[in-house]
């Protein structure tokens, strides 16, 4: 595995804490929409929101990837979905972020997410054999997610 950096600029090791997921099999589109929504939340509020998404009580608003996505009755959400697998991975990432903050001696109740970014990872190419000697490509895009929090 290669050497990974962070896309967050202005990182101060005394004020910020960060965590990342690398090469996970989750949708990069779902990860982007979740990242956009939890940025600015406290860690506890983000965890409660993601738990509600897994229980299908609150929808993640889709702002960019919203074609053919149904409307939801949540306030402030026009088009939205319930990406359970991505939300579960984000909860694990929040646990990692809290562990890193605890190691640094930060107050966990005052952590606010200031950077949440999702990137496309590597492409895994596979092929499905079809009739008459043809084959259909089946590509799988892995995802990188980065979280940065600041003690407010």
UniProtKB/Swiss-Prot annotation:
Gene3D superfamilies: Ribosomal protein L22/L17 (3.90.470.10). GO terms for cellular component: cytosolic large ribosomal subunit. GO terms for biological process: cytoplasmic translation. It comes from the Archaea. One of its GO terms (molecular function) is structural constituent of ribosome. This protein binds specifically to 23S rRNA. It makes multiple contacts with different domains of the 23S rRNA in the assembled 50S subunit and ribosome. The globular domain of the protein is located near the polypeptide exit tunnel on the outside of the subunit, while an extended beta-hairpin is found that lines the wall of the exit tunnel in the center of the 70S ribosome. Part of the 50S ribosomal subunit. This is Large ribosomal subunit protein uL22. The gene is rpl22.
